[in-house]
UniProtKB/Swiss-Prot annotation:
Additional remarks: Present with 2490 molecules/cell in log phase SD medium.
Assigned protein family: Belongs to the beclin family.
Protein name: Vacuolar protein sorting-associated protein 30
Pfam families: APG6, APG6_N
Taxonomic classification: Eukaryota, Fungi, Dikarya, Ascomycota, Saccharomycotina
Length: 557
């Protein structure tokens, strides 16, 4: 073991070795009694010094308390008592070993006596039994006792250490000192406790002197001072009563004021709640108004965007040339095309008459559309677009024309089919002019008449622009428009049945390159006519024509 203060190894006092359970309990109980007694003595002495009238400890008890010796001064006998409990305990191994050895000796001797009795009985009954060797039994018993004693001695040392450790732990838990401690540490501890005890005694004496001084001062008060004090107390009592009445009146006034303030507070709280409700209502109305404004602004912005989109769409629609979008005139190799239909045929690439008739039907439909939209009055002609079987009605000019015609039309009108009839016709054999050739010639006449009337319409638009313009810039623009749109000149000259010197008549023969080229020139003039008509139709005569009049060929889309 080690000292719990300086941590140096310790050698236990011989009196602490081999303690029985009863001795250890007595040691622990004495320590607790001494501690409690010392505390009671110190407290009783302090009470006695503070109050002489309190209960006192008899002197006989104090004398007996002073005669109590320290546990180290006790000369305890190291007797191995056999009065322990029947339960085998680790710290009573020595006693149990003695009890066990004694019981075994008694048992051995008892067995020997029993055997002797049995032997005597057997000798008297049988006469043939043998006697045991007593020396061998005693030797075996002695060997067993020695072995058990060695085991008990080795077990007793660890048991004593554990027992003393438990004792020291219990002592440490009951006091403020950690056990075990060495002799030097114990002396230092005793000196420290003595100094603390002396300081406590001095402090107790100081308080006792102060208490006795106060008691002596209280006894020195005379009767006269008491009477003066009594009269003074009476006057003070009257003053206090008056002050009490005054304070009661003031309290009543304050209570009334408090009631008024409570009522005012309730009224103000109600007004506060009302104002908060009004504020919340205003905020709600304002939020609703803001929400409506936001929704209105969104709708307005949406309408503006829709309006701008509609304007843009309208501008796009205005810029769209309905004639160009509806009638797409282009070319495909040596052939001129209208809406993808080839107008013409050559031996190297034969085009069926159905496709040629359909292209001519589209051409008649285009001319009829221009006449209708621009309100062109063709007095001597009437277009009848009927697809691949379109016709032209021509007014009869003289009787010769009427006599040569085989059609008995009502009135003075001659109906000319603008399609090639593949049925047998006698005129084809003699290479004479057919009604199909006459219809193509009439088509050239109609295009020339439309060109003349469009030039007249453009001139009238130019004169109206000049009269309505007020500033110089607009007049200049009008002059430019007049120069550019008043006169329509087609790229290829048309004269009777020829266009640019090429005849449009077949005279019953099959289409050839010359006729195909003439049809190409025809569609080119019609495309120019279409562009000019688009400008007039859109009322935008200040814009330049969509087709360059210097270009005399059909450009592809």
């Amino acid at each position: 073991m080690k000292c719990q203060t300086c941590h140096l190894p310790l050698q236990l006092d011989p009196s602490l070795e081999g303690l029985s359970l009863t001795q250890r309990n007595l040691l622990l109980s004495n320590n607790s009694i001494i501690t409690a007694t010392n505390e009671n003595v110190i407290s009783n002495k302090g009470i006695e010094a503070a109050d002489n009238c309190g209960p006192q400890i008899p002197k006989e008890r104090l004398r007996r308390l002073g005669e109590i010796q320290n546990i180290k001064d006790l000369n305890l006998k190291d007797d191995k008592l056999i009065t322990d409990s029947f339960v085998f305990l680790n710290h009573d191994d020595d006693d149990n070993a003695n009890i066990t050895s004694n019981s075994r000796e008694d048992q051995r001797y008892g067995n020997a006596n029993g055997n002797d009795n049995k032997k005597a009985n057997s000798d008297t009954s049988d006469g043939t039994s043998t006697f045991r060797d007593h020396d061998e039994e005693e030797q075996e018993a002695t060997d067993e006792d020695e072995n058990q004693q060695i085991q008990l001695n080795s077990k007793t040392l660890s048991t004593q250490v554990n027992a003393m450790t438990n004792v020291f732990n219990i002592l440490s838990s009951q006091t403020n000192i950690d056990f075990p401690i060495c002799q030097d540490c114990c002396n230092i501890l005793i000196n420290r406790l003595k100094s603390e005890y002396d300081d406590a005694i001095k402090e107790r004496d100081t308080y006792a002197q102060f208490l006795s001084k106060l008691e002596s001062q209280n006894k020195e008060i005379s009767e006269s001072n008491k009477e003066k004090q009594y009269s003074h107390n009476l006057s003070e009592k009257e003053n206090l009563k008056k002050e009490e009445e005054r304070l009661l009146d003031q309290l009543l006034r304050l209570e009334m004021t408090d009631d008024d303030l409570d009522g005012e507070l309730v009224r103000l709280q109600e007004k506060k709640v009302q104002l908060e409700n009004e504020k919340l209502q205003k905020l709600s109305d304002q939020n609703l108004m803001d929400l409506n404004n936001i929704q209105f602004n969104k709708n307005l912005q949406s309408l503006k965007l829709q309006y701008e989109l509609s304007l843009n769409q309208l501008d796009k629609l205005r810029k769209i040339n309905i004639f160009n979008a509806t009638f797409k005139i282009s070319h495909s190799g040596p052939f001129a095309t209208i809406n993808g239909l080839r107008l013409g045929s050559i031996p190297e690439s034969v085009v069926p008459w159905k496709e040629i008739n359909a292209a001519l039907g589209q051409l008649i439909l285009l001319l009829a559309t221009i006449n209708k939209n621009l309100k062109i009055n063709l007095v001597d002609y009437e277009l009848q677009p009927m697809g691949s079987f379109s016709k032209i009605k021509k007014r009869m000019v003289n009787s010769v024309e009427y006599n040569n015609s085989t059609t008995n039309a009502p009135g003075d009108w001659l109906i000319l089919p603008v399609y090639y009839d593949e049925n047998f016709n006698l005129g084809r054999i003699f290479r004479k002019e057919t009604k199909f050739d006459k219809s193509l010639e009439t088509t050239l006449e109609i295009i020339s008449e439309i060109t003349r009337q469009l030039s007249t319409i453009a001139s009238s638009y130019s004169s109206q622009t000049l009269t309505t313009s007020q500033d110089e810039s607009s007049m200049n623009n009008a002059n430019d428009v007049e120069n550019s749109t008043s006169i329509l000149e087609l790229p290829y000259i048309m004269n009777k049945d020829k266009i640019n010197g090429l005849s449009v008549k077949l005279h019953g023969s099959s289409p050839n390159l010359e006729w195909t080229t003439a049809m190409k020139f025809l569609l080119t003039n019609v495309k120019w006519l279409l562009a000019f008509s688009s400008n007039l139709l859109s009322k935008s005569i200040t814009l330049s024509p969509t087709v360059n009049y210097n270009d005399k060929t059909i450009s592809g889309n």
